[in-house]
Design a protein with these regions (language model features):
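Conserved alpha/beta-hydrolase
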Residues: 5, 12-34
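Alpha/beta-hydrolase active-site loop
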Residues: 35-58
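Gly/Ala-rich beta-loop-alpha elbow adjacent to hydrolase catalytic centers
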Residues: 61-70
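Hydrolase active-site cap/lid region
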Residues: 75-125
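Active-site nucleophile elbow and catalytic-triad environment of alpha/beta-hydrolase enzymes
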Residues: 118-136, 141
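Short alpha-helix in the alpha/beta-hydrolase fold that links the catalytic acid
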Residues: 132, 141, 155-164
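Short beta-strand/loop motif that positions the catalytic acidic residue
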Residues: 138-140, 145-147, 151
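Catalytic histidine-centered segment of alpha/beta-hydrolase-like enzymes
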Residues: 177-182
Length: 182
């Protein structure tokens, strides 16, 4: 994975100035974490662990795969109840994500099928069950979903569908920022 906590640093200072405590971590397989590989389910478990370790979270800000991990974590951990959640360019589902990976890596169909089989074995579930838009239906926090029209990695419509399924959320569209500069 390309991302690390440092890329989210622009959010930190304004939150600190408003009196919030900010906790940031490199998810498994990201940045300076000890693991080399991860998946969105592992990411969601790590997020729940961090929140339980540091205490109640007033809000969560997550980008890309972290957005999917956050919605899955909130769906599967009803005892974790942040007031606000911001998802920036969120990944919609594991299925869509691996389809993008297949396209970028130009994997032949039979190789991709074996990749999916291995991934599902690792997860212990079908990739169809890992769906942020569906999980968003169960999130009680107030949500803000932000997605750029020019995101070349995750389509703008992904953020739209997550927001549409999230009862108490707003959707904001940006233009010209892509996936990483948003």
């Amino acid at each position: 994975w390309e991302s690390l906590t440092l890329l989210m640093s622009n959010f930190v200072e304004p939150l600190l100035q408003q009196g919030f405590r900010v906790v940031a971590f490199d998810a498994p397989g990201h940045g300076h974490s000890d693991t080399q590989a991860t998946d969105v389910v592992d990411f969601s478990r790590a997020l729940a662990h961090v929140i339980r370790h540091v205490g109640e979270a007033y809000g969560i800000v997550a980008h890309s795969c972290g957005g999917a991990a956050t919605t899955l974590m909130l769906e599967n951990n009803p005892d974790i109840t942040p007031t606000n959640v911001v998802l920036v360019a969120p990944m919609p589902s594991l299925q869509k994500h691996v389809e993008v990976f297949q396209e970028l890596a130009a994997l032949p169909g039979h190789v991709f099928a074996r990749f999916i089989e291995g991934l599902e074995r690792r997860l212990g579930m079908s990739i169809l069950e890992v769906d942020a838009a569906s999980a968003a239906q169960h999130v009680k926090a107030k949500g803000l979903i932000i997605h750029d029209l020019d995101d070349s990695l995750i389509p703008h419509s992904a953020g739209y569908w997550i927001a549409k399924n999230w009862q108490d959320s707003s959707f904001v569209t940006t233009t010209g920022l892509g996936h990483l500069n948003i």
